[in-house]
Amino acid sequence: MANVWGVRLADSLSSPTLESRNRSYTLHDFCSDLDASAGKEPWKALRNQRTSEIVAVRLFRPLQGLILDTHMYGFPGEFDAWEVFVKEKLRVLKYEVLRVYPISGYSNSHVNVFVANALVGAFLSNQAFYDLLPLLIINDTMINDLLGAGVSLAQFFQAHGDVLEVAAGRKYIQMNGYSNDDDDPPLFAKDLSDYAKAFYCESFEVLDRFFWTHDASAGVLVHYDKPTNGNHYLLGTLTQMVSAPPFIINATDAMMLESCVEQFAANAAARPAQPATRLDQCYHLRWGAQYVGEDSLTYRLGVLSLLATNGYQLARPIPKQLTNRWLSSFVSQIMSEGANETPLWPQERYVQIAYDSPSVVDGAVQYGYVRKNQLRLGMRISPIQSLSDVPAPVAWLPQYTIDQTALEDGDMVGHMSQLPLRPEYGSMWVGEALSYYVDYNQSHRVVAAKELPQLPDTYFDGDEQYGRSLFSLARRIGDRSLIKDTAVLKHAYQAIDPSTGREYLRAGQSVAYFGASAGHSGADQPLVIEPWLQGKISGVPSPASIRQFGYDVAKGAIVDLARPFPSGDYQFVYSDVDQVVDGHDDLSISSNLVESILSSCMQATSPGGSFVAKINFPTRSIWYYIEQKILPNITSYMIIKPFVTNNVEVFFVAFGVHRQSSLTWTSGVYFFLVDHFYRYETLSAISRQLPSYGYVDDGSSVTGLEVISIENPGFSTMTQASRVAISALCANTGNSRKTISIYESHGARVLMLVSRRSPASAKRKARLRYLPLIDPRSLEVQSRTIMPSTPVLFENSNGASPHVCLTMMYNYEVSSAVYDGDVVLDLGTGPEAKILELIPPTSPATCVDIRPTAQPTGCWNVRTTFLQLDYLSDGWITGVRGDIVTCMLSLGAAAAGKSMTFDAAFQQFVRVIAQSAANVVLVQVNCPTDVIRSVRGYLEIDQTSKRYRFPKFGRDEPYSDMESLERICRATWPNCSITWVPLSYDLRWTRLALLEAATLNSASIRIAELMYKYMPVMRVDIHGLPMNKSGNFVVGQNCSLTIPGFNAQDTFNCYYNSALAFSTEDVNAAMIPSVTATFDNAKNEWTLDMVFSDAGIYTMQAVVGVNASPIALGSFVVDSPDVDITDAWPAQLDFTIAGTDVDITVNPYYRLMAFVKIDGQWQIANPDKFQFFASATGTLTMNVKLDIADKYLLYYIRDVQSREVGFYIQHPLQLLNTITLPTNEDLFLSAPDMREWAVKESGNTICILNSQGFIPPQDWDVLTDTISWSPSLPTYVVPPGDYTLTPL
């Protein structure tokens, strides 16, 4: 693909090859044109492409004789009026013509086009025209008739011996709306009077002799192919100018430009069987070339005309309707820097045609053309395919050549950078609340308030306030109170009273809302109230009423909630009071306010009721107050963090208020708060590193945008600076997404590239010694317009997908494991080599992948090697260094590709690594670390074939189990320590993501956290110190670790997520139910006996010596208890309101609730229908009240104590679908869902449930408390019968 200065040409040739025959212009044709009948008018309306207003008219014969000033014609300025005016004038002129030349005698007589144009022009300007009528019909030839005329026609024609001078009439006229707007059509100076003169003669030789003695400095133009109306030269005027911003061009250039564009359009449209009016539309320069330089527009248009005649095509299609904007851009490209990269150069006296040009104009039969046998273009013949414009920037993947330059050269082209600029900020986080919670669990260790973590001392420092503010501004969400309230209610309504088996919070309760505000957009009350009352919050039944209290209420009572007030009693009090309103940032004042609010909540809650209180600043003093004043007077509690914005605010939920108990804080609360504060500190630190909201990006921030703009880009050796600039952007931004736009801007065609710099890309750039240069080919071939958009820092409005979030989690683990100078061997690197952005720039790296790398080579400052091979093959690793081996998201695919089991692939992986000098292996494995459950839509697990299926990608991989993988490791490395790297819920992994300007999505994070359980990271310290496990590492059971090789003075720490679970330095402070540590001097080993109350991954660390050096000992997994569950139904079912008791056998660790699946969505079943309680023998009993509708619904028992409801247990209650209903006693009947249902008794329809205006049969009664799955659907008591239900 060649460039001619800034004009990009296509890589194929095309020309019209079939020419239509000329047809003589007869008097019949002339009169038909004067009729101007609809659809056959001798003009064409031209519109502004933005407004669609008609702003100009293109004129055809016989209207091309308008040579006087516009005011001489008296034309109306609006097209509709102009058209009426002209049609009336032409109609009158036709009758004048027919009066002299009756159609009956002159119908086929040939008309002199020169005279026809002049006649119409004179008539429309009210000039004398009768002298022209005798010349209308051709006697000899058009030219000779006028040369021999004895009348004075100097206004239109002049004779110069054998040469006839004809004034060029307008080809366009402007309407009032024409303003030379960017979207107006270009008129090429042909709307001006006297823009050119035409000189006609029977032979070109006579014309040449004429111009020997006349001034040709303006440039003499010629149509060699089928010159209109005869051989002629065209002399444009230098005084008539037309604007093509930023250029002003004269009439000669304007005419060349128009003809050149027309020929390029004809080339693109050419087809073998499609005739063209003219094979070569171009004007060529016949005289005057000596007056133009190679940098002039005239000369360059001459080159383009030559190329168009030879069949070259523009790489970028010409729009069907030209605009001034497009033309300005085209002229700007013509005049930009560069060179003519084609072998064609214009000659003054003839047009050279290449030997292999598809054009059939030829000097053998046509004057002015010479085919050059020695001139060959070597291009294929094919019309260019027109591509549609693209409305938004398109992603671009850079590719590299072996060329390099100095890194400093990239800084030298800074003039192409668009920095500083003010980008849009976008959203760093989208989606609903990411909720975390903990509730009271009596199996947990008792913890005092003083042992709970304290609010960070720096919380009110200025930089932390800035971080919170930035996160809040860049967090895209609707009404934040609504989102938080909804999340809190969903969790609170799931809590179950173990003494009754029913939820604490149920439908129809009275509710008080403390802190209600009328300041919500579009409502004069908190936005949660209306959907709550209407039962539209999934899993949250509607209350009987909600009364509002607070400073800013509109539908309630104004009151100071921190002081006693006559509120009345409510079964549920929801307090959304902010301590910052009265307490600001004074912790003592705000803590006292919390205590007052908690007291008000207690006073307003009826016995056995519940309340929620928001705590903005959870300090130990508040926990101590709750411990002393609240916990003894409630039966259970829950702490919820609906993570919407980054702060330490939590919601405390109290259940069973005013009932005595011995509740305490627990280790679960301790772990929850540790994660909570770590999560806040992590995101606060990240936010403080991000640029400020609304910032001006000058390139100094670690995270930001890189934008370069290249006008009229070419990629020849003449525009090396452009290539260096693009390469510098790629070096600055690494693997960040890059987008390109190619568009018109102020007369220039612009290439804009946008990407993002980050600490990760800075690491990669710091590794470079030289600047690798990109291959511009993929940019060169772009001929489309790709529209730009305003650069956005966080651009993904939907947020990262679950798979991207999962990858970010792995990236964090890799970056955390590698230290300065570590030699890294990365397996399954991928073409993008992300590893180079994760490890220190001082760390040598060997990257191995079966696919070729897309990274440059030979440009690195530190040894960086790329090997293309199968890393599961033998022999290749000899001599390859690697202190730490990393392998992420690769081994499963490699096993699938080789049709191996995961065990076999992992064994070969270990065998290969064992031949190296590696100390650490960090590998992502396909291995469940928890109860096997599919992740809907993302991960399907086939336990029979031991395969993972990824439906989003249409692939599957094998998986293994933890024991097998550990056994394979220890068989090769007996003394290794193995760590199953836990996923921390403090979100520390988001640092890399957010600093790379990746938008996170709450739902995606939840899914990625689930997937991580089945695709964990395994760390093997090959030369570590192993732990020996004994006993059952199951929640609530005794287990022990034996750790040899340490001294009695050494200490062992155990971590659960981010929190310290216990330390042997003080086992009494342990956060697990039981731990004892003993040292055997004889065996020189430690034994740790433990009981755990939380399932998950625990990591062990030894602290040795006077320097307290940490040594990783590996990890172990504490499993949840057995998930087996059975339901034993009695032989005789009870269809009365007493219900049927069903014995449930399940481990008491699990808390259960009944759910129903409606339209594929889980709904909590009505607690009045299903009740769980402990029987006298200590077993679990489920009481269910039976309904005819049960046969038509899918009920399940699901566990509710995990972060994911139903993660461990989803047990179908299949008997409900198969029960035989009695026909001799009253039964209960509800609608199975909200649709209309036909109720049939013995096959006869007796009524339609849920129908409009439904009235139950007279022998039906309504049950006071519904036992339908939904509390909003009534239950009827129906007489004995044989009932069936049919949906309508």
UniProtKB/Swiss-Prot annotation:
The record marks K190 as: Involved in formation of the phosphoamide bond. One of its GO terms (molecular function) is GTP binding. It is found in: Virion. The keyword Nucleotide-binding applies. ATP binds at G892, A893, A894, A895, A896, G897, K898, S899. One of its GO terms (cellular component) is viral outer capsid. InterPro entries: Ig-like_fold, Reovirus_L2, Reovirus_L2_4th, Reovirus_L2_6th, Reovirus_L2_7th, Reovirus_L2_8th, Reovirus_L2_GTase, Reovirus_L2_MT1. Keywords: ATP-binding, Capsid protein, GTP-binding, Methyltransferase, mRNA capping, mRNA processing, Multifunctional enzyme, Nucleotide-binding, Nucleotidyltransferase, Outer capsid protein, S-adenosyl-L-methionine, Transferase, Virion. Pfam families: Reovirus_L2_4th, Reovirus_L2_6th, Reovirus_L2_7th, Reovirus_L2_8th, Reovirus_L2_GTase, Reovirus_L2_MT1, Reovirus_L2_MT2, Reovirus_L2_N. It catalyses: a 5'-end diphospho-ribonucleoside in mRNA + GTP + H(+) = a 5'-end (5'-triphosphoguanosine)-ribonucleoside in mRNA + diphosphate; a 5'-end (5'-triphosphoguanosine)-ribonucleoside in mRNA + S-adenosyl-L-methionine = a 5'-end (N(7)-methyl 5'-triphosphoguanosine)-ribonucleoside in mRNA + S-adenosyl-L-homocysteine. Its EC number is 2.7.7.50, 2.1.1.56. It comes from the Viruses. Belongs to the orthoreovirus lambda-2 protein family. Interacts with protein mu-NS; in viral inclusions. Outer capsid protein involved in mRNA capping. Catalyzes the last 3 enzymatic activities for formation of the 5' cap structure on the viral plus-strand transcripts, namely the RNA guanylyltransferase, RNA-7N- and RNA-2'O-methyltransferase activities. This is Outer capsid protein lambda-2. The gene is L2.
